[in-house]
Amino acid sequence: MKRLGAHVSIAGGIENAPLNARAIGATAFALFTKNQRQWKSPPLLPASIEAFRQNCADGGFEMRHILPHDSYLINLGNPDPLKLERSRAAFIDEMQRAESLGLELLNFHPGSHLNLSTPDECLRRIADSINMALEHSSCVTAVIENTAGQGTNLGNRFEQLAALIEMTDDKSRVGVCLDTCHLFAAGYDLATADAAGETFREFDRVVGMRYLRGMHLNDALHPVGSRLDRHACVGKGKIGLDAFRLVMQSPAFEEIPLILETPDSDGWAEEIRMLYGLQ
């Protein structure tokens, strides 16, 4: 089964996330487990944790279909030792928060070298950060999101994702989330069914489909290779519907969270219905 959803709000309490997902007809969802604009947040209350788990169960959401995202403040490749330490501590906290909720995944952007080190040195720092976080948690999988390649962000090439996985000690607890807008912006063509098929075959060759743990289904405002991370509603950008039809019809994308991060949250329910209609 295809598991579609969106990145929903936790306003009023994290236990509201599954309710918000259910309201749009989702069968998966993404969320932040804290205020993503702050380095530190108070611990989750036991009552909120219990209510979150109960609402997930009541809504039919399995934990493997929920894709929490870490704070955008975190840079696991930061060349500054003090800032790197702060990012690592925050990432470990994110892993432990996810674990306390019973979640199985944590989605994150790999990191940036800020023109202060080589890309290879930055990849090593990111991999070391992943290994540290896995040592400080017991069951959550670190899910690396591909990037558009803006600025000095790494993770825009499949080879970089493969390198991070190779340097991760416990490969059973590392995976990838493919964002379609980021793929397109990074130069991987998705504008036709043939092009999209070749892009996913290349991912399989370089990284391996066995590591795919989720996707962000976003169209792109800018042309292929722009390196600009600007999302559009599905079918209303430069990608078009062919790639999304392929995802919805291919068995390779079964039973992983397929998450909308498109700009019109009021239209998510309709986008979900439209995507299911592509099957």
From Swiss-Prot:
It comes from the Bacteria. It holds the Pfam family AP_endonuc_2. Its cofactor is Zn(2+). SMART domains: AP2Ec. Zn(2+) 3 binds at residues 182, 229, 231. Its EC number is 3.1.21.2. SUPFAM superfamilies: Xylose isomerase-like (SSF51658). GO terms for molecular function: deoxyribonuclease IV (phage-T4-induced) activity; DNA binding; DNA-(apurinic or apyrimidinic site) endonuclease activity; phosphoric diester hydrolase activity; zinc ion binding. Belongs to the AP endonuclease 2 family. HAMAP family: Nfo. This is Probable endonuclease 4. It comes from Chlorobium luteolum (strain DSM 273 / BCRC 81028 / 2530) (Pelodictyon luteolum).
